[in-house]
């Protein structure tokens, strides 16, 4: 188990992690939040690339801030931006990474690398330099390097940003096949990634873990409370943002479709619609509802 207790991290006046508490068991956990929420700071801390100012992080009962090698030997990490040796082929680079991870048996390395390259659909490109890969291919290669050594903890940070829909789906399919016996943390600002993949999730904003629960539980929390209306006048939209709990606005054929959170109909012209995960996400992120009725209070 991975246990994060009362963790803080500051960069000058910025409180990047503010009293984070989170326990994770094997399975896929999605961490949603806008850019600047503190997600990458948390991921880098879990990967032992930096230490918290306060609090403890334990992995299977061992404090990783004091004994980082305990988690490093079990970790697969795909950061938001990762560099490669520009002239090395995918095959050679994975072999190099495998050696760094402690896989000394050449035959074992060869078998693992071949299996992973086939799994991420890069086997036919094994002799090509990784620097020549497209964005989607690089991300799939990133998954392969993260899975070398059969890690029990996998951290992926903003993995689908910039990918086209097909590459995004390929990536999520690979991640979903990584194994139910591993703790997999998917940190992203893309709501669909969590919706499509995770059975457990958290919402992070301004350095705090605002809420943690199953996606369907967060959706159920506001069921029957999301109303929508097409508004033609921009001034009316601006006023609604002041007067109501506006979840989202989007332009549609010259007008603005406004979605609001309300326990009952706000009035004439408003229509009740099915709740989506993004509604629950914005409701918690904007402080329209608290986490007190969720399964896991942050």
Task: Give names to the regions the model predicted.
Residues 34-38:
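Walker A (P-loop) phosphate-binding loop of ABC-type ATPase nucleotide-binding domains
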Residues 47:
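Helix-to-loop junction immediately C-terminal to a conserved catalytic motif
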Residues 55-66, 70-71:
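Conserved ABC transporter NBD signature motif
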Residues 95, 99-102, 107-125:
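Conserved ABC ATPase "signature" region
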Residues 148-152:
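A short, proline-enriched helix->beta-strand linker immediately N-terminal to the Walker B motif
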Residues 154-158, 163:
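Catalytic Walker B motif of ABC-type/P-loop ATPase nucleotide-binding domains
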Residues 170-259:
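ABC transporter nucleotide-binding domain
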């Amino acid at each position: 188990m991975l246990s994060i207790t009362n963790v803080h991290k500051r960069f000058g006046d910025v409180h990047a992690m503010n009293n984070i508490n989170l326990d994770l068991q094997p399975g896929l956990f999605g961490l949603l939040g806008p850019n600047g929420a503190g997600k990458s700071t948390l991921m880098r801390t879990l990967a032992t690339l930096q230490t918290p100012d306060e609090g403890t992080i334990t992995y299977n009962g061992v404090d990783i801030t004091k004994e980082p090698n305990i988690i490093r030997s079990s970790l697969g990490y795909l950061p938001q931006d990762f560099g490669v040796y520009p002239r090395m082929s995918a095959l050679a680079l994975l072999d190099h990474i495998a050696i760094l991870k402690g896989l000394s048996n050449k035959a074992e390395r060869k078998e693992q690398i071949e299996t992973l390259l086939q799994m991420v659909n890069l086997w036919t490109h094994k002799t090509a330099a990784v620097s020549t890969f497209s964005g989607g291919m690089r991300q799939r290669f990133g998954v392969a390097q993260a899975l070398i050594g059969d890690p029990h903890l996998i951290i992926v940070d903003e993995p689908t940003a910039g990918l086209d829909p097909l590459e995004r789906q390929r990536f999520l399919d690979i991640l979903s096949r990584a194994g139910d016996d591993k703790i997999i943390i998917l940190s992203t600002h893309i709501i669909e990634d969590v919706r499509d993949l995770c059975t457990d999730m958290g919402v992070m904003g301004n350095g705090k873990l605002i809420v943690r629960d199953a996606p369907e539980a967060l959706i159920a929390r506001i069921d029957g409370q999301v109303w929508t209306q097409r508004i033609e006048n921009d001034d009316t939209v601006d006023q609604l943002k002041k007067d109501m709990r506006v979840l989202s606005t989007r332009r549609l054929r010259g007008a603005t479709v406004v979605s609001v959170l309300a326990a009952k109909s706000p009035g004439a012209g408003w229509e009740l619609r099915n709740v989506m995960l993004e509604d629950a996400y914005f409701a918690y992120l904007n402080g329209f509802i608290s986490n007190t009725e969720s399964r896991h209070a942050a």
